[in-house]
Amino acid sequence: MKVVEVKHPLVKHKLGLMRSADINTKDFRALATEVGSLLTYEAATDLETELVEIDGWCGKVEVERIKGKKVTVVPILRAGLGMMDGVLEHIPSARISVVGIYRDEETLEPVPYFTKLANDVEERLAIIVDPMLATGGSMIATIDLLKKSGCKHIKVLVLVAAPEGINALQAAHPDIELFTASIDSHLNQHGYIVPGLGDAGDKIFGTK
């Protein structure tokens, strides 16, 4: 499995701001979008382009365009919605597929409750967004759903990832690509990433 920890100074700076215990909802939400945008930029570096001829201001000119790669962005509800706009800034024509999965606080197992995928998801590159890759359970379940629907090309964007989640994802889906702003230290006894971001969903939505 390809794992990319994006070490750009802007990514590290913005993620550092997000780690503050007293960050407000407005700033956390904005930074989640900004870091999601920067991760998208990194994840899109291998998209193929082709030359097309257009009418320029001084006549015909050849320009590069993305070559026939259709995209669907897949936010995992609910926290993934906080990163979705960062992807759409660069790929505004992407279709939106939604997967609702929550983690049982006692068993830490993923529990699916809603799925609405793009009609032609099997023809698209799926970019899954979720702030945290902790145990990996929710992400693995989401990828399972996408593959069962025929999706073959999948990339994952997360703000922070735990080694435990990366290992689980590698074991379950070695063919996907993972892009993260940080590989953090470990999971604590409650299944939270350390140092992590706290509860990203609560911080994005202003709930507790």
Curated annotation (Swiss-Prot):
GO terms for molecular function: GTP binding; magnesium ion binding; uracil phosphoribosyltransferase activity. The keyword Metal-binding does not apply. Uracil binds at I193, G198, D199, A200. GO terms for biological process: UMP salvage; uracil salvage. The keyword Nucleotide-binding applies. It comes from the Bacteria. Its EC number is 2.4.2.9. Pathway: Pyrimidine metabolism; UMP biosynthesis via salvage pathway; UMP from uracil: step 1/1. Its cofactor is Mg(2+). Belongs to the UPRTase family. PANTHER family: ADENINE PHOSPHORIBOSYLTRANSFERASE, URACIL PHOSPHORIBOSYLTRANSFERASE, CHLOROPLASTIC. This is Uracil phosphoribosyltransferase.
